[in-house]
Amino acid sequence: MATETNGADVAASSPGMPQLDFSTWGNQIFWLVITLVIIYMVLSKVALPRIAAILSERQGTITNDIATAEDFKAKAKDAEAAYEKALADARAEAQRIVAEAKADIQSDLDVAISKADAEIAAKAAESEKAIAEIRAGAAEAIQQVAKDTAQEIVATFGGKADAKAVDAAVDGQLKG
């Protein structure tokens, strides 16, 4: 019990928390300054250079990535321009091929049309010639039939038909 009583006396005689005991503040401030200086030295010599190196490396990586992205963007623009040019060239080539094909087809068509026109003209001339021959033949046939009919009519009425008179009468009627 003596120790308990002695501990109780010490507790009763001490002013409270040791940090708030003004008699030890000088020592506390000294050790606080020493601790802060040591922490500052450790941070400035070890931790802060590592952090600065990491931040610098990160900034370099970001800068390199941005530069790479800009290069890729420029390459993409160049590729797009090359694509557009190739597309325009292909369209121009296609239009040229279409124009050539149209010209070839038109020339073939013109040749075929002129050939068909020549054939039609030749057949029309042949047909006109045949029609003229048929008309001439028909006119002669009509003339002969008219003469024969006139002779038969005269013979039917009891007269004797003079061939020269019948020919002259039929020719006169047919001509005018």
Swiss-Prot record:
CDD domains in the record: ATP-synt_Fo_b
Cystine pairings recorded for this chain: none
* Topology of this chain in the membrane: Single-pass membrane protein
Q: What are the subcellular locations of this protein? A: Cell inner membrane
Q: Which GO terms describe its cellular component?
A: plasma membrane; proton-transporting ATP synthase complex
Q: Which UniProt keywords apply?
A: ATP synthesis, Cell inner membrane, Cell membrane, CF(0), Hydrogen ion transport, Ion transport, Membrane, Transmembrane, Transmembrane helix, Transport
Q: Name one Pfam family in it.
A: ATP-synt_B
**Molecular-function GO term, any one:** proton-transporting ATP synthase activity, rotational mechanism
Quaternary state and partners of this protein? F-type ATPases have 2 components, F(1) - the catalytic core - and F(0) - the membrane proton channel. F(1) has five subunits: alpha(3), beta(3), gamma(1), delta(1), epsilon(1). F(0) has three main subunits: a(1), b(2) and c(10-14). The alpha and beta chains form an alternating ring which encloses part of the gamma chain. F(1) is attached to F(0) by a central stalk formed by the gamma and epsilon chains, while a peripheral stalk is formed by the delta and b chains.
Family according to the record: Belongs to the ATPase B chain family.
The name this protein carries in UniProt is: ATP synthase subunit b 2
Q: Which gene encodes it?
A: atpF2
